[in-house]
Amino acid sequence: MLDIKSLSASIDGKKILEGFDLKIKPGEVHAIMGPNGSGKSTLANVLTGKNGYEIEGQVLYQGKDLLNLPIEERAQKGLFMAFQYPLEIAGVNTNNFLKTSLNTIRKVRGQKELDSLDFLKLVKTKTKNLKIDEKILSRQLNVGFSGGEKKKNEILQMTILEPKLAILDETDSGLDIDALRIVSDGVNALRSKERSFLIITHYQRLLDYIKPDFVHVLVDGKIAKTGCGELAVELEKVGYEKMGANK
């Protein structure tokens, strides 16, 4: 699914990732944990095509070079990113945004586009399953949303688009327990042998609900340690300094 080899990334002359390696197979859930400034969000930005980085190394997605693909093509090929700070887009209706996004993906997949009625049935089912208020659909995209509402909307998008690889960049940040469960329920509902997840988080609590296959500790732009879910529990007890992070 995703094969990262010797990835280095710099911005404004400062190297953030250096010699980063990671391989994610179809159906796997990987969690990346690390202290602030370790390169977690930089990794997500590089994978999703954010501009401004000087990049070296290789990233293969489904066997093809990911780094040369424009942002929109990455999304069309099934790469999804749930942002830590989702953008507000005034004048764009949430329901229309979701419908357009889904039909764009369906067209690329060679599937028939959904009309308004069929999409409405789909999105109502998704909001009900996630316990999200349907009123969110009639509002402007993320405008005036609370932090929790924005994160819920990201997960709603994910469940509608059904990506092949979903990246969650600290989606659990600032969430209360109810919103955290909505996020985890959305991920768990999509888990399958064909779909993979890369969960980037600072804390272990999200991994109480989403059981990862692998946990990686990112320190100074490199993976310092890899283990199973128990590694996240260990981190909560001993902290990142024990893994080689600077104070």
Model features per residue range: what roles?
Residues 2-4, 17-19:
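Conserved structural motif at the start of ABC-family nucleotide-binding domains
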Residues 33-35:
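The feature captures the beta-strand-to-loop junction immediately N-terminal to the Walker
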Residues 48-49:
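Helix-to-loop junction immediately C-terminal to a conserved catalytic motif
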Residues 58-74, 142:
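ABC ATPase NBD Q-loop/coupling interface
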Residues 87-164:
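ABC-family P-loop ATPase nucleotide-binding domains
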Residues 167-171, 178:
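Walker B catalytic motif
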Residues 214, 218, 222-244:
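Conserved beta-strand-loop-alpha-helix hinge in the C-terminal portion
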